[in-house]
Each structure stands twice: as C-alpha cells, then as structure tokens.
C-alpha cells in the first residue's frame, strides 16, 4: 500500500511536467504503465535507427513553457525551419495548399483561386466551431480548395463523416490566407511563414524521447510499469495491477478521458454515458530505414486516393542522428476508424507511394521497418463531444480531480500545450 498527496496517471509530457513542478513541494506518484517515460513522446531503437511515434516536433508559443522545454533539453536541441509540402495531381506544391497553389496544374489552380475569391466575397467569417466541416470548408475556402485538398485529406485523417465533424479544432491548425496571399501563392512567389508550425525544435540526439527522458530525470515519484486498473475518486484510492491500493488526496489524469471514466468506480451513469459517446481514430505509423534516399523536405501531405496514407515524413531530416551514416528514416501514417490495418498490404502501398512521389527511389533501399500503433490518436470533434465534456468535467471538478493533456482533456493539441497544462495543473494544487 502507498499513500501520496497527488496521484498522476500517465507519464507522458503532461504528467512529467506536473511532476517536475510538484517535486520537493508535495509527494506524488506518476503511474506510467510502460517501461519508459513519455507515452507517445518516446523513441524506439531498431537496427541503428531511432523511430518516434510519427512526427513529434516542438512548436513553441508561450514564454514560460518554451523556457521550461528548452532548459530541459539544454544544448541537445536543433531549431529548424519547416519544409512541408503537398503532393497532389502528381505534383509537389508547398504547404499550406490554400496559400501555395503554384505547383498545381493550371486548371486546378484556377478552380481553387476563383472558388476562394467567391467564398471570401460572400463573407461569413470562420464561424463558431459548431458548423459541419464539409459545409465550413466550402464556405471558407470555396469549392476548388475544398475538393482538391480539404475534403479528401481530412476524410483520410479523421475517418469520420465530415458532415458530422465540427470545426472547433480548426483555428490553430488550418491556416487562413487573405485573397492577396492566395493569388500571390498561385501566380507569384511562395507564401512563407503561414501556420502554427513554421519553425520548430527537435532534439539533436535521442529522438523526441530525449525530451521525455530529460523531464523524467530527478523525478522521485515516477513509477514505470505501474498500471492503474481502477480509481475511486470519492474514496481517494486507486487499484494498481500486481501492486494493490494507492491512496491519494488529489488526482491528475492524463490517460484518455473515456478510458479514465470507464475505470472510475464512482462515476455516475450520466458521466459514463457521456464518456461512451466520445470518439477517436486510430493511427498506424510505418517507420522505414533506408540506404541513401536523401531528400530535403521534412514532411508531406497526400490528399489523393491513390495514396492510402495521409502523411509521410523524413525523420532523419529533423536530426541526422536518427539514422546511421548514409541512411535516411521515414515515417508513413495511416488512419482507421478503429479497425485493424492490413500491415503487409499497407507496407507495400507505402513503399510504392513513396517511390511514386520521389521520396524513395526503389523498394530495395529499405533495410529496416517498424510498425507503431497509436490506438487513440486524434479525438473526434462532434456534437456529442461538445455535450459530453461539460458533464464529465463537472463531475471531475466536484471530485477535485483534473484531467489534462491531449487525451485527458480530449482535444487536438500539440506537445507544448500538454507541458503547459501539466505545469498549470500542478500550480493549482500548490495554491490550493
């Protein structure tokens, strides 16, 4: 039996950051079920390559969290300027598609520009987040950009009906150009610096797991291989597999919100119904190690139906230390609505697709492969989510518990935001 002031479920970036802020000020236990810290912000080694769970890049916006993250990395960091592209109609064009149409065929370019200008002149603004995505993108970007990129790409990514997907998530992640930028990006020079991720940081060595390892250093309460099976917030006790009870005064959850409610013994029926309505997709990441295959881009988006994956990147362009000398490493992302992916067929399609777009010369270059599965990858924004979260969060507040991070708060966010929420959650406990 253990007793602690604070139980933190999950040793990802949110949980590790909360622990760092609590260190020496309150007793805490971070229960991380895996044998390494970081959750999805971890790195796996195989055959001399280091593979992440897809592209995990540090886009820093806030001074306090930026300093916290950069101090943790110390000199083990690189600052890079984004080189992201879109491959559509057998051509490359810079990302974001809507502001960089110059690479597209003339007919596609004209459709996209004229459609955008019509939509812009019709007015209406970005909306309040409740509008269905399929209607919103046509209203905001016009028929051309929607048909050639927004609709096919997002259908591949979310694996959820776009007529039911709401748009609350769009503001930080979908850049909105002006008419001048759209025209200039189609017929003039490339539009630079648009979007939230134009510059990013990445560890020089160790993959993104280097950040998690740095945050875990000196964490007296981190317990790896500790899986929480059930929680009773009213009684302040958690049952841990192969260990027994852990008693706590306050709790911070960073595990998927629906899973947390399901294992909470004291969750009322209304809260359970709300959690059961939450939806997410599943992402399978194929990591490839290859001889040679030097290309200068960081990652690319693939809206076309000829590519079953939605995005692919060259991780060794984030840091050369991710691959042996003379080699490159790739990641290719496939999404499903939760069903299993045929890995053998998907791998063949990935290699064929990378060769078709020129990222890879030939299949024989591939020397290493590793599949990584993200069971809960992107949480779905729909009307059910909007109705469920107030119910669940109201119960958590009454129990003086916090659920934070990308999955604990059930939202689409980036790594710095998880760190920020961890620090803020700890701050609230220290002030209580």
Predicted features, each with a name:
Residues 248-250, 258-402, 413, 420:
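C-terminal segments that line or cap access tunnels to active or ligand-binding sites in enzymes
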Residues 406-430:
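A conserved FAD-binding loop/helix module that cradles the flavin
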Residues 47-125:
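Dinucleotide-binding Rossmann-like beta1-alpha1 core, especially the glycine-rich loop
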Residues 7-9, 31, 246-260:
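Short hydrophobic core segments
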Residues 4-30:
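N-terminal Rossmann-like FAD-binding beta1-loop-alpha1 element of flavoenzymes
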Residues 91, 102, 109-236, 247, ...:
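Active-site/ligand-binding neighborhood in enzyme catalytic cores
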